[in-house]
Regions:
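Active-site-adjacent structural elements in enzyme catalytic cores
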Residues: 1-204
């Protein structure tokens, strides 16, 4: 994928919606996503990889319960500490954490593995507009900012975006957003869920 390796952007399907993204390790590509989506600079972009081993090079899994790791690949995003100097600063929150998941979608996973890097996976829509479930739903202005649209593989399921949790040192998990994986299902798995003042905030 020469385009992605050179800092370009693609629109591609994920398990939930179409995403617009590029290499999460390339500051120029990250900036282009913000510009294309007219996204607030204070909202970090989520990141996805084709396998957990690839993510393990860049984030710290120390406090992640095994039961959550068994949900990967899947629509579960975890806010984890990033290793220093790896990701562009715009992908990090104030505590140096990044929102990551392992995507089960074969196209998105193959792209990540092909460039040997995580991808930014922000939904393919202008900020505050509806996300795109099909390639035809992608707005023209956003499509023009991408080097291409990959209209192949299984169609995204739509519905809800990924569920977002932040694993904490005491073994519990702060709820950031309930999404495609219901909180009730996670609780039944034994995950200790905590709702705080950050729960429900549109951070990602």
């Amino acid at each position: 994928m020469a385009l992605l390796k050179e800092g370009g952007l693609l629109a591609f399907p994920t398990e939930t919606f179409y995403a617009v993204g590029g290499s999460a390790l390339d500051a120029g590509a990250v900036e282009r996503v913000y510009q294309a989506k007219l996204r607030q600079a204070t909202k970090p972009l989520p990141v996805a990889a084709g396998d957990r081993g690839l993510l393990g090079r860049y984030v710290d899994f120390t406090h992640v319960p095994d039961v959550l790791l068994r949900r990967w690949p899947g629509p579960l995003t975890l806010v984890l500490p990033a290793f220093p100097g790896v990701f562009p600063l715009k992908l990090l929150d104030r505590e140096g954490r990044v929102a990551v998941r392992v995507t089960p979608h074969p196209v998105a996973a193959a792209l990540s593995i092909a460039i040997d890097a995580p991808l930014t996976v922000s939904s393919a829509n202008i900020q505050a507009h509806n996300p795109a479930r099909t390639a035809a739903d992608i707005e023209e202005a956003l499509a023009l900012a991408c080097g291409g649209i990959l209209d192949e593989g299984p169609e995204p399921e739509g519905g809800l975006p990924s569920t977002i949790l932040e694993p904490l040192p005491d073994g519990s998990c702060r709820v950031i957003r309930e999404g495609a994986i219901p909180l009730a299902a996670l609780a039944s798995d034994g995950v200790d869920l905590r709702h705080t003042e950050e729960s429900g905030l549109l951070r990602y």
